[in-house]
């Protein structure tokens, strides 16, 4: 197998990564500008180039049309500024970059993993994941993280030749950092990072890594994701009028939140109940009790932003300090060590996730809407399957023509649906013959 390896680095941490980490699966010619024959040395690191490729990708832009938590009809029109999967990914990338700079990882590797981590999400988020996993059962199901790998290494058009699709052709280090669940599907396991027909490229990415062990950059990305969505989903819930943190002052509500955290996130129930009580007494939390976006003045909005800033900083600092206490000041890269997240911090994050789950995601009207969304995706999938290849976009129609069997053709239809934004899925479904 021919590999492309780049040298040089715009950040000192890039020099700590060996040739295997810098390698790309497909060889690439020198980058041209179309301005003549003048040749200059590439000053960017390979990891900086990775970041640029993801940042400029259509797959990343599509995340602007995919809801994070609060969407149309759920209070977004009140606050007017709901988060999308794109804004969430930008926040994850920024948080991860800061942690990487503290720990000695290459910031571009972690930043890119943060940008890319949700690229595989289908319309309607985790609800869409569930529908596509059911619809695509005969070809191995669906998982957003496995779809991320597929997009980065195959579906996003950037590098390729002949019958070989290279996707964005990112470095091994960046692809490994993007693997939140570095294992294929095992039995009925819900979370996994690669489909069976992506096994070869997954094997290349993971070559030399301990089975099932995430590199430090992936661990930083994952913690940054937890921090971002636990804090910011609560912020969006407050802005939409669905969350009031005064609920943390109720012992009954704290017990209910601890139960949710235990059941859905594997957290220790007693620890969650304890930290929920402690969170309720934080001055930053007390300052936003009773927040109402319809009446809040500047002081109230400043208090809400102070809360999110303090919580993000709290979780970043706790994890970086604990990791440095264990590993010292030597740079941590690839598989040289693990991120240390103290149990108390993990419990606090689990409680915040449970706040959003209890007061936003478990709303009966939302659950009814989600059932309709799953039905829509099933109907759309069946219609595309019946009408393929004419029902597919031209690129996916090419994939359909090259597919060797029914399972591969089903995977093409799943790929097609997964690429759609929320509104595209609704529009495509509306065009179906009645």
Where are these regions (language model features)?
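Acidic, carboxylate-rich catalytic segments that either coordinate divalent cations
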Residues: 2-33, 37, 374-387, 398-434
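Alpha-helical phosphate/pyrophosphate-handling elements in metalloenzyme active cores
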Residues: 75-109
């Amino acid at each position: 197998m021919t590999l492309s390896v780049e040298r040089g680095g715009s950040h000192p941490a890039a020099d700590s990564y060996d040739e295997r980490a810098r390698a790309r699966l497909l060889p690439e010619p020198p980058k041209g500008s179309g301005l003549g024959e003048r040749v200059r040395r590439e000053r960017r690191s390979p990891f900086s180039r990775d970041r640029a490729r993801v940042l400029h990708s259509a797959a990343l832009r599509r995340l602007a049309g995919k809801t994070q938590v609060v969407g149309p009809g759920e209070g977004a029109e009140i606050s007017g500024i709901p988060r999308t999967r794109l804004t969430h990914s930008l926040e994850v990338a920024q948080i991860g970059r800061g942690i990487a700079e503290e720990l000695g990882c290459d910031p571009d590797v972690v930043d890119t993993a943060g940008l890319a981590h949700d690229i595989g999400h289908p319309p309607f988020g985790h609800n869409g994941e569930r529908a596509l996993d059911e619809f695509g059962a005969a070809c191995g199901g669906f998982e957003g993280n496995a779809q991320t790998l597929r997009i980065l290494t195959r579906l996003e058009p950037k590098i390729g030749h002949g019958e070989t699709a290279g996707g964005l052709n990112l470095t091994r280090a960046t692809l490994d950092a993007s693997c939140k669940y570095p294992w294929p599907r095992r039995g009925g396991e819900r979370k996994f990072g690669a489909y069976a027909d992506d096994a070869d490229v997954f094997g290349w990415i993971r070559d030399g890594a301990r089975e099932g062990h995430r590199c430090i950059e992936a661990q930083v990305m994952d913690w940054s994701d937890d921090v971002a969505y636990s804090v910011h989903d609560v912020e969006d819930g407050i802005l939409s009028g669905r969350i009031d943190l005064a609920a943390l002052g109720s012992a009954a509500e704290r017990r209910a939140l601890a139960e949710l955290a235990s059941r859905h996130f594997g957290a220790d129930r007693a620890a969650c109940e304890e930290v929920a009580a402690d969170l309720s007494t934080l001055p930053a939390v007390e300052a936003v009790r009773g927040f109402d976006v319809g009446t809040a003045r500047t002081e109230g909005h400043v208090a809400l932003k102070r809360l999110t800033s303090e919580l993000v900083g709290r979780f970043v600092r706790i994890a970086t300090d604990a990791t440095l206490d264990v590993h010292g000041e030597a740079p941590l890269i690839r598989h040289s060590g693990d991120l240390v997240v103290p149990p108390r911090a993990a419990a606090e994050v689990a409680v915040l996730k449970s706040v959003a789950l209890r007061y936003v995601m478990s709303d009966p009207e939302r659950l009814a809407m989600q059932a309709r969304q799953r039905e829509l995706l099933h109907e759309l999938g069946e219609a595309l399957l019946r009408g393929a290849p004419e029902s597919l976009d031209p690129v996916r129609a090419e994939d359909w023509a090259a597919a060797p069997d029914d399972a591969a053709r089903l995977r093409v239809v799943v790929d097609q649906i997964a690429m759609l934004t929320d509104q595209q899925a609704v529009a495509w479904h509306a065009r179906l013959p009645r």
